[in-house]
Amino acid sequence: MSASGLPFDDFRELIRNLPGPDLGAERAVREREVTLTKPAGSLGRLEEIVAWLATWTGKRTPQVNRPLVAVFAGNHGVTAKNITPFPPSVTAQMVENFAAGGAAINQICIANDLGLKVFDLALEHPTGDITEEAAMDERTCAATMAFGMEAIAGGTDLLCIGEMGIGNTTIAAAIALALFGGTAEDWVGPGTGSTGELMQRKLAAVRQAVALHQPHLQDPLEVLRCLGGREIAAMAGAILAARMEKIPVIVDGFVASAAAAVLYAANPEAIDHCMFGQVSAEPGHRKLLAKMGKEPLLDLGMRLGEGTGAALAANIVKAAALCHSGMATFEQAGVSASK
């Protein structure tokens, strides 16, 4: 803990002093790229992806050998306001489904040869109802961020982050509204299927929560504490830990992007090592990516969460790395280069 004794101070210091890019590694990749057996620039965004990998791993021939999907699960007190068609018990049931191998993310990880870890964040103790009280106190929020930092403990060279939590698109919308302004209508979408009266209650909950906590919302970490969820705090911690350990990150959908947005609001450079795997069908996600100046890799109309979009995008990143490291140069292949 910091000398001040305030749990967030250590994180504020960390966010201010994150390691920067390795421009030498990026330059080496770009220099090799023009020697490979293809017209310059013909692999399009794959060439930018491998340069990004080099920049944040510090490796001049970046590889992806141990990709990991980390899924964080949390429950939310705001679901008591009847904002979603599914009960919060579904969160724990889906965690069991992940463990049994029966969810979409399990199949995508199998298809793409990705590791999978699922983190159950005190599901029996939902966060506070954000329309009535703060989601967490500072100590709990900081401890949850620290827990999320342990996601990389087993070793990985590409981290995909995702989540599971009934009610958490409401939480993500509240965070986005607090960080970037606008109206609740700008950020609130159907989530797991909220329409009609459910949607009206969801909109009202977001408005009420942001109004209630307004005096605290100038500080992004306070936004996370007041309006966030344990899975969102843990994802923010995982993103920070990955930066410290030179591990690139692929962020999944709207909720995972809300975790990244908290860090972005504190320091826009804090998520430079992050790529956004997809743009969700949840309407607020496209707006959120635009606010952060991020372009997603995929647009497949998905809105499941679970890290599914990030996991699909991981295969593109793996392919980019292999194209760069495995392709022959013009000289090696005896192919004539362009004049």
Curated annotation (Swiss-Prot):
Domain of life of the source: Bacteria
Entry's EC annotation: 2.4.2.21
Name of the top EC class for this enzyme: transferase
UniProt keyword annotation of Transmembrane helix present: no
UniProt xrefs under SUPFAM superfamilies: Nicotinate mononucleotide:5,6-dimethylbenzimidazole phosphoribosyltransferase (CobT) (SSF52733)
A biological process term (GO) from this entry: cobalamin biosynthetic process
Active site annotation, chain numbering: E306 (proton acceptor)
Reaction(s) catalysed by this chain's protein: 5,6-dimethylbenzimidazole + nicotinate beta-D-ribonucleotide = alpha-ribazole 5'-phosphate + nicotinate + H(+)
An annotated Gene Ontology molecular function: nicotinate-nucleotide-dimethylbenzimidazole phosphoribosyltransferase activity
Keywords: Cobalamin biosynthesis, Glycosyltransferase, Transferase
Pfam families per record: DBI_PRT
Transmembrane segments: none
Biological or metabolic pathway of the protein: Nucleoside biosynthesis; alpha-ribazole biosynthesis; alpha-ribazole from 5,6-dimethylbenzimidazole: step 1/2
Task performed by this protein: Catalyzes the synthesis of alpha-ribazole-5'-phosphate from nicotinate mononucleotide (NAMN) and 5,6-dimethylbenzimidazole (DMB).
Family affiliation: Belongs to the CobT family.
Name of the molecule in the record: Nicotinate-nucleotide--dimethylbenzimidazole phosphoribosyltransferase
